[in-house]
């Protein structure tokens, strides 16, 4: 394979920039920049870099990783330079004379091709890079440690063990007894049950990776946009005394106790003849159905006249808020018609911590086990595992052993696609195309 190079750190002014070179000719970097110092593997070496005119480009730290003991499994040279745009540009220009610029995710792709990481670990790398909260990072790190790979490889090996027994029975049909068939059926049912339990996870891993959606719902002028802006810590939604100001769905990302929360502002729900407002209300109701959790807003002045359409939205995913509670001193829940409301006044900054704590408790009750157990984190993984289950479900022991064996092979292949034992160009493009250049 050709030798590639790229800037690994973000482009722009910084204290330090890191430029990575990987490939069989990576050590030519030393000769090209006229590095006279003896560079030893895994030792940081301070040295000047020279251009063709023997002018100093920069004084850098060089780190050399010899194959196969590197991230990519190839010879790797890292140049730790000053983060000057001019210096970075000059070094990249020099490297471009002898090497090929790396594409997005190409270093990680080479790590995969050289058996340094499987596909689940490769996906975890990009998830860690994109993580914005502690829980997202923890999930990615756990996956990078191989928790998913070990789980899928375990199921794969169990299927291979069953397949081996099947092949033996095909070669020695006289050994096939009703007990042997029952034992194989029992083992396959156990594997299938484990796979189905893994699939029936409420998509918790994917939700944690993408963000937990919390929709703010209520009548017009119930303080939804005011609360939304307060949680976002900036003015995103237009706040007005006129009812029906919010028409479209707005989103902002916040961090609550390390969990990635996407707060959604919606149009006020009421009867309206305005077609534009009607569309906003329709979208609000859709968000009420699809959101992971809901904040139901009721203005304090309307506590004695509950809107049935709003009350009907309340379920076990809901947190009820009595908004505009400026005159209420208590921090305790207020019970109205057997519904507990958190009194909140945004303008007086009252009840906000109570609300955030309530959101945290709801989220932790649903997602805390994500911090200890390996969960599916991508649609790609889910599709292949579901395919494996479907194949196992369709196995009939009334068919010849040869056909059952073929179905088992297909199921094994689906699990192999998850970790990348079997891969094709489309799968690799889908996984590694999400990476930035330099990773």
From Swiss-Prot:
It comes from the Bacteria. Homodimer. Heterotetramer of two MnmE and two MnmG subunits. PROSITE patterns: G_TRME. GO terms for biological process: tRNA methylation; tRNA wobble uridine modification. This is tRNA modification GTPase MnmE. Belongs to the TRAFAC class TrmE-Era-EngA-EngB-Septin-like GTPase superfamily. TrmE GTPase family. Residues 211-364 form the TrmE-type G domain. GO terms for molecular function: GTP binding; GTPase activity; metal ion binding. (6S)-5-formyl-5,6,7,8-tetrahydrofolate binds at residues 20, 78, 116, 439. Its EC number is 3.6.-.-. GTP binds at residues 221-226, 240-246, 265-268.
């Amino acid at each position: 394979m050709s030798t590639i190079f790229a800037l690994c750190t973000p482009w722009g002014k910084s204290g330090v920039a890191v430029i990575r070179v990987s490939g069989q000719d990576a050590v030519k970097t030393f000769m090209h920049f006229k590095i006279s110092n003896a560079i030893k593997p895994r030792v940081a070496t301070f040295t000047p870099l020279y251009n063709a005119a023997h002018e100093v480009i920069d004084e850098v730290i060089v780190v050399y990783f010899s194959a196969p003991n590197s991230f990519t499994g190839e010879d790797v040279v890292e140049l730790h330079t000053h983060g000057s745009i001019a210096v970075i540009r000059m070094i990249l220009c020099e490297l471009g004379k002898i090497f090929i610029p790396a594409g997005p995710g190409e270093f990680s792709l080479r790590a995969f091709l050289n058996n340094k990481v499987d596909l689940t670990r490769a996906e975890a790398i990009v998830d860690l890079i994109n993580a914005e909260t502690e829980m997202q990072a923890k999930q990615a790190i756990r996956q990078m440690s191989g928790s998913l790979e070990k789980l899928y490889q375990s199921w794969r090996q169990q299927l291979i063990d069953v397949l081996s027994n099947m092949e033996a029975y095909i070669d020695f049909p006289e050994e096939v007894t009703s007990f042997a068939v029952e034992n194989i059926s029992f083992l396959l049912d156990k594997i299938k049950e484990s796979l189905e339990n893994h699939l029936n996870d409420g998509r918790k891993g994917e939700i944690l990776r993408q963000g937990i959606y919390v929709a703010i719902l209520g009548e017009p002028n119930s303080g939804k946009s005011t609360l939304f802006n307060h949680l976002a810590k900036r003015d995103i939604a237009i706040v007005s005394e006129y009812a029906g100001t919010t028409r479209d769905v707005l989103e902002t990302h916040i961090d609550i106790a390390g969990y990635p929360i996407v707060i959604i502002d919606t149009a006020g729900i009421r009867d309206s003849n305005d077609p534009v407002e009607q569309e906003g209300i329709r979208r609000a109701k859709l968000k009420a159905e699809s959101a992971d959790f809901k904040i139901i807003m009721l203005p304090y002045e309307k506590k004695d006249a509950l809107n049935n359409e709003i009350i009907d939205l309340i379920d076990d995913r809901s947190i009820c808020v009595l908004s505009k509670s400026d005159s209420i001193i208590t921090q305790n829940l207020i019970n109205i018609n057997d519904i507990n409301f958190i009194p909140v006044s945004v303008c007086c900054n009252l009840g906000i911590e109570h609300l955030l704590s309530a959101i945290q408790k709801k989220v932790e009750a649903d997602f805390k086990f994500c911090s200890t157990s390996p969960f599916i984190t991508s649609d790609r993984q889910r599709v292949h595992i579901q395919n494996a289950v479907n194949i196992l479900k369709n196995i009939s022991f009334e068919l010849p052993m040869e056909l059952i064996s073929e179905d088992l092979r297909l199921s094994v292949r689906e699990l192999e696609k998850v970790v990348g034992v079997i891969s094709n160009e489309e799968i690799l493009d889908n996984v590694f195309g999400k990476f930035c250049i330099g990773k």
